[in-house]
Amino acid sequence: MSMQDPLADMLTRIRNAQMAEKSVVSMPSSKLKVAVAKVLKDEGYIAGYQISSETKPLLSIELKYFEGRSVIEEVKRVSRPGLRQYKSAEDLPKVRGGLGVSIVSTNKGVMTDRAARAAGVGGEVLCTVF
């Protein structure tokens, strides 16, 4: 059976691993997942990520905790296969008054809402992280 929404699967695996207090979570890799993992690392939400390819490419994400609590409080898929969400640079959502980030897929690559606003580009709002 094929996976309908690989990015939602990635976010669910991260959410479930953090609830189970795991240190590392693995999943099938793709260019989009690696780009989202890079943004999460740059923003300080995960400790790191690694791509290994024995037979199939595998993405391993090292989760981050602070004082026993997960750094990621909430991760939510915004644009989904049944209802895509495209926003212009001015209309990009601020997550919790700017405390969280929206991850946006633009024609200049995957970036945060702040970076997209600064570059003056809009795109598909993939997910929000707080």
UniProtKB/Swiss-Prot annotation:
One cellular component GO annotation, for this chain's record?
Answer: ribosome
GO molecular function ontology, one term from the record: rRNA binding
InterPro entries given in the database record: Ribosomal_uS8, Ribosomal_uS8_CS, Ribosomal_uS8_sf
List the Gene3D superfamilies hit by this protein, alphabetically: 3.30.1370.30, 3.30.1490.10
Which is one Pfam family of this protein? Ribosomal_S8
Q: Does the keyword Acyltransferase apply?
A: no
Question: Which key words tag this protein in UniProt?
Answer: Ribonucleoprotein, Ribosomal protein, RNA-binding, rRNA-binding
GO biological process terms on file: translation
**Which family would the database say this protein is a member of?**
Belongs to the universal ribosomal protein uS8 family.
The function of this protein is: One of the primary rRNA binding proteins, it binds directly to 16S rRNA central domain where it helps coordinate assembly of the platform of the 30S subunit.
Q: Which NCBIfam families match?
A: PRK00136.1
How is this protein organized at the quaternary level? Answer: Part of the 30S ribosomal subunit. Contacts proteins S5 and S12.
Q: What is this protein called?
A: Small ribosomal subunit protein uS8
Tell me the name of the encoding gene.
rpsH
